[in-house]
Amino acid sequence: PTNYNPAADLVGALARPEGRNFATVYDPKKGRDDLGKVAELLRALHSYQGGPVVQAALKLAPIVFVRPGELRHARWADIDLDKAEWRYLASKTKQPHIVPLSSQAVEIFRELHPLTGRGQYVFPGARSRSRPMSENAVTAALRYMGYDGETMTGHGFRALARTVLDEVLSFRPDFIEHQLAHAVKDANGTAYNRTAHLPERQKMMQAWADYLDSLREGGNVVPLRRKAV
């Protein structure tokens, strides 16, 4: 039928958050009433006065919502700013993964490139540019801004995106799960490849970045209705 939605065949969508360390400021039980906390977090991230590498990581974390270790180990060789794509091997599934980059993400990468673009890592360590930044760098910045481990973690950006994209912006669960680099399978148990729904995911990632901008800027954000596509 023309109104068939393949998302209905997904096994276990949406997947449960990975591990215990996924505290995030947004409580889905409170719904849209809790989005003000997200706006406050985003404003704090953009006003952080630390070094430029950590600044860029903090701004990118909610936009791209990759795993914290994948963000830390981001390599310039894997990022194509002209195509607005970041391709790498997902740390958990060990499968090739594509992150479509919103215009906001591309801008952040371009601003950082003159500082770190000659090296291997997008976010090099403070002590050695041949190593990625410390796994505690983003956590320490969050603590400095007043967010403890029970309130917000580096992994919490994934939990935030997963919940808001689904429950507030109403994007299809399979689009979200693919973008989270979870091992998504259809009703036959066949895993989708990395390019599955890529055009739709590109639109979703741009809509997500635009939505976060609207929250941060205090605009009257109207949820999108896309799930029943």
Predicted regions and their residues:
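Short, basic (Lys/Arg/His-rich) helix/loop patches that form interaction surfaces
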Residues: 43-55, 64, 99, 107-130, ...
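Short clusters of hydrophobic/aromatic residues that line enzyme substrate/ligand-binding pockets
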Residues: 10, 79, 88, 123, ...
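Basic, Lys/Arg- and aromatic-enriched nucleic-acid-binding interface segment
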Residues: 2-73, 82, 92-95, 115-117, ...
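C-terminal secondary-structure termini that scaffold catalytic or DNA-interacting sites
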Residues: 29-35, 107, 111-119, 124-132, ...
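Short, polar N-cap/turn motifs at the start of nucleic acid-interacting alpha helices
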Residues: 3-4, 77-85, 149-151, 170-193, ...
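Well-ordered beta-strand positions in beta-sheet-rich domains
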Residues: 85, 96-100
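Short, small-residue-rich loop/turn micro-motifs
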Residues: 14, 72, 78, 83, ...
